[in-house]
């Protein structure tokens, strides 16, 4: 009877795991036992800020600004790539939003302005080269003229020598006279209206600001405010394009006039060279005659 009575020690132990876990481990250190008695961070009240939510008071804003700037740059580069690609990777132009189309219009306007400015720069370089070429042509014409003047001086010296050769000989010798097929007239080209004067006149007018559009530098426009919309930015780019095209038209007109001057200068030089060639041939013929006369006199 007494053997069948259940003792409290034999009762089912439902909380044996909890009791075992609550017993201190003899192998645990004092620090670990103290940490077990501290509060669990997950059981803190919501009013207490967690360490993960705390931000650095000195560097938090800088990090956020850096993230925002990098994100803006990535968005800008992505949009610029889409603009260059004409939205081929995103469904085409017809499937874009109004904001994307406005940015696309501004991008195209800026690219057109850059193209116009590039053409203007090329035209200015061509004008500089044309100016130097025109001056070189003028110097070449001056050299031809000086050479022809030297031929005239040779003609005068040769005429005096021919007179001396004609007076030499004996009393009974035949009088010698040189044969002249044509007179030596000298340079025919007049250089009153030289290309250098026209070039210098053009440069002086440009420095004084008297030309209609001196290289596009006379026009200055106020920059747009940061709050300007896409329409205002496009209109600003269109105004820049108009100015650039006007300057380009003026430079092309100057290049046309320079080309005409070059053509007329080359034509004058060709005529001058023809006259110089004829005079040199005449001088060469007369020199040969004088040499023959001298050899005959020495042979006697």
From Swiss-Prot:
Organism: Arabidopsis thaliana (Mouse-ear cress)
Protein name: SNAP25 homologous protein SNAP33
Protein transport listed as a keyword: yes
Domain t-SNARE coiled-coil homology: 235-297
Regions of compositional bias (Basic and acidic residues) in chain numbering: 190-208
MF-aspect GO terms: SNAP receptor activity
GO biological process, one term: response to other organism
Modified residues (Phosphoserine): 29
Biased composition (Polar residues): 38-49
Function: t-SNARE involved in diverse vesicle trafficking and membrane fusion processes, including cell plate formation. May function in the secretory pathway.
Recorded family membership: Belongs to the SNAP-25 family.
SMART domains linked: t_SNARE (SM00397)
Keywords in alphabetical order: Cell cycle, Cell division, Coiled coil, Membrane, Phosphoprotein, Protein transport, Transport
Gene Ontology, cellular component aspect: cell plate; plasma membrane; SNARE complex
Tissue specificity remark: Ubiquitous, with a strong expression in root tips, ovules, very young leaves, vascular tissue, hydathodes, stipules and the abscission and dehiscence zones of the siliques.
């Amino acid at each position: 009877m007494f053997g069948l009575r259940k003792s409290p020690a034999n009762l089912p132990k439902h909380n044996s795991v909890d009791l075992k876990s609550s017993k201190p481990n003899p192998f645990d250190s004092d620090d670990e036992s103290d940490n077990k008695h501290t509060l669990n961070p997950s059981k803190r009240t919501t009013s207490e800020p967690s360490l993960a939510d705390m931000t650095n008071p000195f560097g938090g804003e800088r990090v956020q600004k850096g993230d925002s700037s990098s994100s803006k740059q990535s968005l800008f580069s992505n949009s610029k790539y889409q603009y260059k690609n004409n939205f081929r990777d995103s469904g085409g132009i017809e499937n874009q939003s109004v904001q994307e189309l406005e940015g696309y219009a501004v991008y195209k306007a800026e690219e057109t302005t850059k193209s116009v400015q590039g053409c203007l720069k090329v035209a200015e370089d061509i004008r500089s080269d044309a100016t130097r070429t025109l001056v070189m042509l003028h110097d070449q014409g001056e050299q031809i003229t000086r050479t022809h003047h030297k031929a005239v001086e040779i003609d005068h010296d040769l005429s005096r020598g021919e007179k001396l050769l004609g007076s030499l000989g004996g009393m009974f010798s035949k009088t010698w006279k040189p044969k002249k097929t044509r007179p030596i007239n000298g340079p025919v080209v007049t250089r009153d209206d030289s290309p250098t004067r026209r070039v210098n006149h053009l440069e002086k007018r440009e420095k004084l600001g008297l030309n209609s559009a001196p290289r596009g530098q006379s026009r200055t426009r106020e920059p747009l405010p940061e709050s300007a919309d896409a329409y205002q930015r496009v209109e600003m780019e269109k105004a820049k394009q108009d100015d650039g095209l006007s300057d380009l038209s003026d430079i092309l007109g100057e290049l046309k006039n320079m080309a005409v001057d070059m053509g007329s200068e080359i034509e004058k030089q060709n005529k001058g060279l023809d006259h110089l060639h004829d005079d040199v041939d005449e001088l060469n013929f007369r020199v040969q005659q004088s040499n023959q006369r001298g050899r005959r006199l020495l042979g006697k």
